[in-house]
């Protein structure tokens, strides 16, 4: 079926014409919040979206990303609804002023804002992306490589090739959109 069409509605139509057995499984999902158990009303609902609806949903995600961007340029990384806090359950011992954060996902937030700017031309997105880039610059470590200054992103006591690669992509996308040369030094270093 995957070679015939990418449209879910067409795949369903093909399946309906194909001899097979189907079973309907009914389930319920719940989440705990403080002392309450709350039902979730989500599921895989079949929807067909227009390009405009997809764009609006993407922009709503970018708006949410901006809404939860901190003054230092970081984005909200983790929220625990049960405990109503921002402490990552995999890193519960981190101090409140230094909660766990992921530089790769940070770069994803920057690229999201740049894409929103490309779709709308709204400066709020590119300004948020710049704040995110400025935070990433603070994570840059420099070293000498063959007589030249090279750089990499160092965060959470480690350097990841993907972290440096993603910030390079984000900086280049930002530069292409704004012609702002303020990150050229870092682009060359990475």
Q: Where are these predicted regions, by residue range?
A:
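Positions within ordered alpha-helical repeat solenoids
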Residues: 67, 115, 138, 142, ...
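Well-ordered alpha-helical scaffold segments within catalytic/enzyme domains
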Residues: 36-52, 107-123, 165-180
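Aromatic side chains
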Residues: 75-77, 117, 125, 135, ...
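Long, compositionally biased, intrinsically disordered segments
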Residues: 70, 129, 133, 151, ...
């Amino acid at each position: 079926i995957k070679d015939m069409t990418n449209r879910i509605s067409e795949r369903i139509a093909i399946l309906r014409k194909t001899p097979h057995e189907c079973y309907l499984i009914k389930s319920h999902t719940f989440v705990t919040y403080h002392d309450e158990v709350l039902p979730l009303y989500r599921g895989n609902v079949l929807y067909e979206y227009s390009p405009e609806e997809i764009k609006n949903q993407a922009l709503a995600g970018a708006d949410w990303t901006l809404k939860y961007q901190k003054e230092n340029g970081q984005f909200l990384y983790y929220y625990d609804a049960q405990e109503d806090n921002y402490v990552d359950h995999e890193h519960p011992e981190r101090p409140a002023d230094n909660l766990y954060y992921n530089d790769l996902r940070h770069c994803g937030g920057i690229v999201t804002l740049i894409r929103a700017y490309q779709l709308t031309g709204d400066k709020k997105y590119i300004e948020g992306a710049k704040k995110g880039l400025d935070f990433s610059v603070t994570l840059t470590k420099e070293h000498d490589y063959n007589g030249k200054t090279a750089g990499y992103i160092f965060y959470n006591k480690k350097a990841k090739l993907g972290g440096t690669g993603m910030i390079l992509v984000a900086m280049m996308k930002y530069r292409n959109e704004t012609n702002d040369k303020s990150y050229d030094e870092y682009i060359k270093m990475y």
